[in-house]
């Protein structure tokens, strides 16, 4: 694939589609009506800003953004610095601690350093009303994120998709397993993590696959940005 191919090239035309305009208009109207919508407007498309199409090595699919204050910032499972790691992320850290030698559980939940290394942290729905999980499901975001997955499937090779839980696994049905790698496990939520997420070893498996294909492994130790 040409190194210059960007998200703008392959999904930029979605911005002109009626469904996408309607989704953005609905979210804008909700904000204008005084409702608190997460993440903040400038963070909604962060996953694409931080991980360009030609840089994607791993995709971790989430469902919809966290709906508590100061949590969501456009990356699945990640929270802003200074906010405690939510329960699913605590379980992700538990798994990393047993899977990756030397992993130290961080005192934060900010996963931007993963995104900067080529881990696309993609929620299938990109906004949510405060305190109201799944409130923005079926607005049109799913159509958009299906197009994102289709673009990765078509324009990239050897991407590792981590599909945790039935929702992500259903979303991943379109992925060509001849060209890409799929790692499946239950969701890391406390309701299901003990059914096989804990012990799945997805993080070490991903790094083995990357190294087998001549790529840099991911440093899974989340790092806060250093002060300039």
Swiss-Prot record:
It comes from Yersinia enterocolitica serotype O:8 / biotype 1B (strain NCTC 13174 / 8081). Its EC number is 3.2.2.27. It catalyses: Hydrolyzes single-stranded DNA or mismatched double-stranded DNA and polynucleotides, releasing free uracil. Keywords: Cytoplasm, DNA damage, DNA repair, Hydrolase. CDD domains: UDG-F1-like. The active site is at 64 (proton acceptor). SUPFAM superfamilies: Uracil-DNA glycosylase-like. Its main location: cytoplasm. One of its GO terms (biological process) is base-excision repair, AP site formation via deaminated base removal. InterPro entries: UDG_fam1, Ura-DNA_Glyclase_AS, Uracil-DNA_glycosylase-like, Uracil-DNA_glycosylase-like_sf. GO terms for cellular component: cytoplasm. Gene3D superfamilies: Uracil-DNA glycosylase-like domain. Excises uracil residues from the DNA which can arise as a result of misincorporation of dUMP residues by DNA polymerase or due to deamination of cytosine. This is Uracil-DNA glycosylase. GO terms for molecular function: uracil DNA N-glycosylase activity. It comes from the Bacteria. It is found in: Cytoplasm. Belongs to the uracil-DNA glycosylase (UDG) superfamily. UNG family.
């Amino acid at each position: 694939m040409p190194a210059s191919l960007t998200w703008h090239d392959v999904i930029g035309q979605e911005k002109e589609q009626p469904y996408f305009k309607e989704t953005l208009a609905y979210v804008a109207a909700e904000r204008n009506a005084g409702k608190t919508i997460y993440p903040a407007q400038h963070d909604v498309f962060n996953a694409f800003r931080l991980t360009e199409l030609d840089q994607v090595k791993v995709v971790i699919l989430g469902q919809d953004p966290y709906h508590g204050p100061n949590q969501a910032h456009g990356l699945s499972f990640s929270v802003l610095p200074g906010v405690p790691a939510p329960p699913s992320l605590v379980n992700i850290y538990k798994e990393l601690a047993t899977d990756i030698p030397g992993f130290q559980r961080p005192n934060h939940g900010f996963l931007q350093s993963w995104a900067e290394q080529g881990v696309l942290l993609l929620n299938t729905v990109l906004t949510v009303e405060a305190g109201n999980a799944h409130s923005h499901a079926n607005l049109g975001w799913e159509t958009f994120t299906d197009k994102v997955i289709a673009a990765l499937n078509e324009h990239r090779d050897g991407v590792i998709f981590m599909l945790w839980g039935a929702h992500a696994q259903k979303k991943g049905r379109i992925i060509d397993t001849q060209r890409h790698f799929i790692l499946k496990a239950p969701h890391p939520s406390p309701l299901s993590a003990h059914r096989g997420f804990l012990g799945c070893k997805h993080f070490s498996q991903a790094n083995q696959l990357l190294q087998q294909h001549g790529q840099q492994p991911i440093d899974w130790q989340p790092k806060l940005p250093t002060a300039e």
